[in-house]
Amino acid sequence: MKKMYAAALLTAGVLCLTSAVSAAPSQTAAQETVKTPLQQMHMGTSEEKNHRAEIQADYFQHRGERRYINLYNLHVFRQYKEMHGMSLHWGLTVTRPVGSWAEKDAPTVRLDSGAVGVGPSYMVRWTKPLGKKWEASLDLTGGLMVYNKVHPAHTRNYDFMWRIGPRLTYHFNDRNALSIAYLGHHVSNGQRTKNPGYNGVGVSIGYRYTY
């Protein structure tokens, strides 16, 4: 009788052990299923959008009376958002105005206004694809420039710089693209006094890298 009782206990123990081993993988899988959303929350998913960096070089020639200031600009942008054909970019601009201007009371006296400026900039771009390799866009850029001296002469040492115009881009491959634009610009400090705003038109060459 004792032997039969011991055999029954042994059989029951083996069955319990087998059930526990079989249930372990299911519990582990369930735990992993629960952890996955948390891991995605902290680590992000692998399906992240591409980042785009762009560098642009401009040359603008002056337009308007008594304003003889040409611009050489260098911009570096990073795209941070894209939606419905519109993209948003933030960046940095370095500008080198060269030339002079004349006050209204002394139109023949040219005041040297060469300077170097730097400041944050922001670009909004509307893009329309033209096939697999080409795209056309309209760029609108605004920036706050701070100069190493008063610019233009006899005014202030800061300005707002605006650019607008069409751009044509050619994609060499999925990562590299080259563009050219025809832009107009306006520079002004936004004040009622000491604000000889000036305008210009010119070309811009850009290189974009997708990573």
Spans of model-derived segments:
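Extracellular loop and loop/strand-boundary signature of outer-membrane beta-barrel proteins
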Residues: 60-63, 105-112, 148-154, 189-194
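Short glycine/proline- and aromatic-enriched beta-strand/turn motifs that initiate or cap beta-hairpins
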Residues: 20-81, 204-211
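Residues that define the transmembrane beta-barrel architecture of outer-membrane proteins
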Residues: 49-51, 66-72, 112-120, 156-162, ...
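Gram-negative (and chloroplast) outer-membrane scaffold detector with strong preference
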Residues: 70-149, 208-210
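Transmembrane beta-strands of outer-membrane beta-barrel proteins
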Residues: 47-55, 86-92, 118, 136-142, ...
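Predominantly the C-terminal beta-signal and adjacent terminal strand-loop region
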Residues: 39-52, 167-211
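Bacterial N-terminal signal peptides that target proteins for export
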Residues: 1-9
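Bacterial N-terminal signal peptides
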Residues: 8-18
